[in-house]
């Protein structure tokens, strides 16, 4: 999650955000793991950046999480629609960009049927072991306006 106080603490005078102190206490574990999974319980909906109750974190936060070694993002959660369908779509766009440049993967939400089929379940192979990851949520605080982008629900 990314609360208002965290956003303010990370803000720099030039308008950027720096999260370099995040995860320092667990970095040695991240560095020595083959698979690091993060529950991304916020959107990357763009400005204005907000905390509770409708989360929208700076894009730099997702980049920092990736740089720390997280390589799987779980995206289905009650906050994924905090900025409605447009915010969720922008979040997926950022995750796709990270997936192309940094070999991260995500599951739990999808922009279309093809993406849904590729990520649900998310199948990964690490050291010759095949791993299936399924991510779903009980619901969202603000429902999606249409069938796509799709959210995996527990009832599905």
Specify the residue positions occupied by each region the protein language model found.
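Acidic, metal/ion-coordinating pockets
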Residues: 1-156
């Amino acid at each position: 999650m990314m609360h208002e106080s965290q956003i303010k603490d990370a803000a720099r005078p030039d308008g950027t955000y720096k999260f370099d102190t995040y995860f320092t206490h667990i970095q040695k574990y991240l560095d020595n793991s083959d698979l690091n999974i993060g529950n991304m319980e916020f959107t990357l909906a763009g400005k204005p950046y907000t905390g509770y109750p409708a989360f929208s974190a700076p894009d730099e936060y997702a980049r920092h999480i990736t740089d720390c070694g997280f390589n799987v993002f779980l995206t289905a959660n009650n906050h994924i629609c905090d900025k409605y369908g447009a915010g969720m779509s922008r979040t997926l766009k950022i995750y796709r960009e990270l997936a192309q440049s940094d070999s991260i993967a995500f599951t739990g939400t999808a922009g279309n049927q093809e993406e849904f089929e590729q990520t649900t379940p998310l199948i990964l192979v690490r050291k010759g072991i095949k791993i299936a990851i399924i991510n779903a949520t009980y619901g969202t605080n603000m429902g999606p306006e249409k069938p796509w982008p799709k959210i995996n629900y527990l009832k599905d």
